[in-house]
Curated annotation (Swiss-Prot):
Membrane topology per record: Peripheral membrane protein
NCBIfam families according to UniProt: fliG
Species the sequence originates in: Bacillus subtilis (strain 168)
Site (Part of the EHPQR-motif): 164
InterPro entries: Flg_Motor_Flig, Flg_Motor_Flig_C, FliG_a-hlx, FliG_M, FliG_N
Protein name as it appears in the record: Flagellar motor switch protein FliG
């Protein structure tokens, strides 16, 4: 293999050379942990390797060794700890090079370090920040963690932060890096960079699912005034039909009483076995037999009809919850049933 080609090896080619260098026994044990597709791709690369000089083999083995060590350091104490150890052992430039490749392959998200911090620590930092900064940080955190923080913000700020998470699309790496840098100083952690999709309605739904019912109501009521369409879209996604499995038996029975049989039939037609089992367990035996018989002879159904039927059932679930007749489990353990 020409020297010029060696300097431009791809990750797949390096993996192939590493397997060859490790020998048959070790390579065979590695293969046991790969998928069929990965084995096929790797074998194809190995078959294309002609000759590699010892120096290049040693460089690839050393590179693999350094990355493996770095990954171990990350699992022990995060990127910050890994960076400190590698810089001390290998120097700043080499450590940075290794971590850049590793974080790229691991797809480390921005603010990954913040997931290890207590919600109170993050709250102390962000509560005086602009709502857009709060939204950016919360959109990257674990939903339960973000929900706890959102619950503690001033009520007049909560809805605005939730709205900004919902309408957030892409954020430039420069802004992410700057916010991370400041947060790093406060929490003694590290940052990563790249354009990353964040925010959106799904993100705010996950966050709101992590707050208590009172906080959720306050935020949604405020959003109803600011942006009714957005509030309605968020409500639709707060509880989906499949979430019926999280309700207790009494709640499911109450829902069944209010829904139209045709809507329930359509919804169950394409539902998972888990959903069907839980719903059937809360019906009379005669009703179950009737439903199963009708489902068996029901022809193909349009996805749009199913989604509309499930949406109507979800609306009933939310109305029953708002009326206090059923309870939907929330994050934070604040839903007390007496």
């Amino acid at each position: 293999m020409a020297r010029r080609d060696q300097d431009k090896l791809t990750g797949k080619q390096k993996a192939a050379i590493l397997m060859i260098s490790l020998g048959l026994d070790v390579s065979a044990s590695v293969y046991k942990h790969l998928t069929d597709e990965e084995i096929e791709r790797l074998t194809l690369e190995i078959s294309g390797v002609r000759s590699v000089d010892h120096q290049k083999k040693d460089e690839i083995i050393e590179e693999f060794h350094n990355i493996a060590i770095a990954q171990d350091y990350i699992s022990q104490g995060g990127l910050s700890y890994a960076r400190q150890v590698l810089e001390k052992a290998l120097g700043e430039d080499k450590a940075e090079n290794i971590l850049n490749r590793l974080t790229s392959s691991l797809q480390v998200k921005p603010f990954d370090f913040a997931r290890k911090a207590e919600p109170e620590q993050i709250l102390n930092f962000i509560q005086q920040e602009h709502p857009q900064t709060m939204a950016l940080i919360l959109s990257y955190l674990d939903p339960v963690q973000a929900g706890q923080i959102l619950s503690e913000l001033n009520p007049e700020v909560q809805a605005e932060v939730a709205r900004r998470i919902a309408v957030m699309d892409r954020t430039s790496p420069e802004i992410i890096n700057e916010v991370e840098r400041i947060l790093e100083q406060k929490l003694s952690s590290a940052f990563t960079q790249d354009y990353t999709q964040t925010g959106g309605i799904e993100a705010v739904v996950e966050v709101l699912n992590g707050v208590d019912r009172g906080t959720e109501k306050t935020i949604l009521d405020s959003l109803e005034i600011q942006d009714p369409d957005l509030a309605e879209e968020i409500k639709k996604r707060m509880f989906v039909f499949e979430d019926i499995v999280t309700l207790d038996n009494r709640a499911i029975q109450r829902v069944i009483r209010d829904v139209e049989n045709d809507d329930l039939l359509l919804s169950l037609k394409v539902a998972s076995e888990e959903v069907k089992e839980i719903v059937f367990n809360n019906m009379s035996q005669r009703m179950v037999e009737t439903f199963k018989e009708e489902m068996e002879f029901m022809g193909p159904v349009r996805l749009k009809d199913v989604e509309e039927a499930q949406s109507r059932i979800v609306s009933i679930v939310r109305k029953l919850e708002e009326a206090g007749e059923i309870v939907i489990a929330r994050g934070g353990g604040d839903d007390i049933i007496v």
